[in-house]
C-alpha cells in the first residue's frame, strides 16, 4: 500500500505515536528520557512510530532520517533502531534489547515479528554479536543478519548523521546507507521477503534504549512507499 510523509523537523509531531520513554523535544524525537538536568535516565526504552499503518505486499519503500547520538561518557549504551512491526507492537526490554525484544525470546526468530536497522553502541556478550560498535540489520532476532563496524569517531562525533533505508519489493533487498558529514559512510544489505514476514498491516518507527550515558535524537524523517504491481504485468 502507498504511504508518504515528510518531517523536515518535528515542530509538529502530528501522526507520531510516542510510547515508553520517548517524547518530542526541541523539534526532535527524543527516544529515551533525560532527567531535569539533561542526564540520560538508565534502563529505559521508548518508541516513536508513524501512526498510520501500511502493507508490504507488492510494495517498495524508501525512508531517510537524520539523527544525533549524545553521549556523556566513553562507554554509552545501548543504541537505537528504525524498525517495522505490526501496529500493536509494544515497547519491549531496555538495554541491549533496544526496546524491540524480550530477554527470553530475543534470539528466537520464530517468536518475533520485527525487522530493524540497529545502531548499536554497546557490545553485549549475552548473545553472539561483534566485539565492536556496529550498525546491523535485524530480522526477528537481536542477533543481526548483517553487520558493519561503526567507527568510534562517528559514534562520538555528535554530528547529525543521515541514514537511508530502502526496500525493493521485487528483488526483496533491504539496504541501509549511513553517512556522516565529516566521517564515515556505511552500507549494508540483506535479502529478506518482508511481505512474507508481515502479511498484514505494519507501522514504521524508531526505538531507543539505555543503558546509560546516552540519548538518541531523530531530527528529520521522510518516507514513501510505492506499489510494485504496475511493473508486474
From Swiss-Prot:
Gene Ontology annotations for the cellular component aspect, listed alphabetically: extracellular region
UniProt temperature dependence: Heat stable. Retains hemagglutinating activity after incubation at 100 degrees Celsius for 30 minutes.
Keyword field contains Transcription regulation: no
PROSITE patterns reported for this sequence: LECTIN_LEGUME_BETA
Sites where the protein binds Mn(2+): 118, 120, 129, 134
Record note on pH: Optimum pH is 6 for hemagglutinating activity.
Sequence similarity: Belongs to the leguminous lectin family.
Protein task: Has metal-independent hemagglutinating activity towards erythrocytes from rabbit and human. Hemagglutinating activity is inhibited by glycoproteins fetuin, asialo-fetuin, thyroglobulin and azocasein but not by free carbohydrates. Inhibits ADP- and epinephrin-induced but not collagen-, fibrinogen, thrombin- or arachidonic acid-induced platelet aggregation in vitro. Has anticoagulant activity in vitro.
SUBUNIT field: Monomer.
More details: Hemagglutinating activity is independent of divalent metal ions.
This protein's name: Lectin
Organism annotation: Bauhinia forficata (Brazilian orchid-tree)
Lineage: Eukaryota, Viridiplantae, Streptophyta, Embryophyta, Tracheophyta
